[in-house]
């Protein structure tokens, strides 16, 4: 069961002396048919596990993961489960997979943040809607500098943790198709407008064709090294 799996992770956290256990609801596929029922199920699992988690002296950090929840939905989950033992692993890249401005995500979830995943994103308009692509740190147009400044101010003492994923082809969001909105029926217009503002600032930034002479491992290493270098240089200026 989900409770048994979480219990095993809590035991593992105690062994390695981790103060948190990261967990996820699912992915964007779980929005089909309504994300609400999955949120309710996760709240039930967390409530059933409350004593186990609190007795261990750890907290559960729920990630906004792979297009599953928008910020207001994850905030509601944390509040319903109990913020005394449930918080957030905030990912700066995943909001764009839910047509959400990452800065709005941070503003909404900052009080609950336990740790982070950070990577940059490029967003731009297309005839059908919008395109998004994850990039090396500093190479996107989402405003990573301001994001980190806000994170440090609103989440003092929390880790700046890089999760470097550089996309190949962009992910397309054809929001001009009425059927698209079946997945986002509860999204307020003002929230979506903030996402569009980021798209308006962008321009198409397709990924460079992979060099067949470079292995995927070497390419990933180069992405990580470039992202770490940029982040260290930026943090040194603060």
Where are these regions (language model features)?
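Histidine-acidic metal/acid-base catalytic patches
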Residues: 71-85, 96-238
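Active-site-proximal loop/turn and secondary-structure-junction residues that shape catalytic pockets
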Residues: 25-29, 66-68, 92-94, 122, ...
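Active-site acidic/histidine proton-transfer and metal-coordination neighborhood
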Residues: 1-88
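A short, structure-level motif marking secondary-structure boundaries and short turns
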Residues: 33-35, 59, 91, 132-133, ...
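Active-site flanking residues adjacent to catalytic metal/cofactor-binding acidic residues
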Residues: 62-63, 90-91, 119, 162
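Positively charged, amphipathic and often flexible ligand-engagement surfaces
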Residues: 22, 52, 94, 117-120
């Amino acid at each position: 069961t989900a409770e048994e799996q979480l219990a095993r992770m809590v035991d593992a956290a105690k062994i390695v002396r981790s103060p948190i256990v990261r967990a996820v609801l699912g992915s964007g596929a779980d929005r089909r048919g309504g994300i609400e029922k999955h949120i309710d199920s996760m709240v039930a699992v967390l409530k059933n596990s409350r004593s186990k988690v609190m007795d261990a002296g750890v907290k559960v950090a729920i990630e906004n993961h792979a297009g599953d929840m928008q910020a207001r939905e994850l905030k509601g989950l944390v509040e319903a489960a109990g913020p005394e033992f449930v918080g957030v692993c905030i990912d700066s890249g995943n909001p764009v997979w839910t047509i959400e401005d990452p800065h709005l995500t941070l503003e909404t979830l900052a009080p609950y943040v336990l740790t982070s995943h950070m990577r940059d994103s490029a967003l731009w308009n297309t005839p059908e809607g919008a395109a998004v692509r994850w990039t090396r740190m500093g190479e996107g147009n989402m405003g990573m500098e301001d994001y980190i400044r806000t994170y440090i101010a609103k989440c003092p003492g929390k880790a700046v943790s890089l999760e470097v994923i550089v996309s190949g082809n962009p992910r397309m969001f054809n929001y001009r198709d009425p059927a698209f909105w079946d997945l986002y029926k509860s999204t307020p217009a003002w929230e979506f407008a903030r996402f569009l503002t980021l798209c308006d600032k962008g321009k198409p930034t397709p990924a460079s064709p992979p060099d067949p002479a470079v292995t995927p491992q070497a390419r990933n290493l180069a992405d990580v090294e470039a992202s770490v270098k940029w982040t260290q240089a930026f943090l040194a200026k603060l």
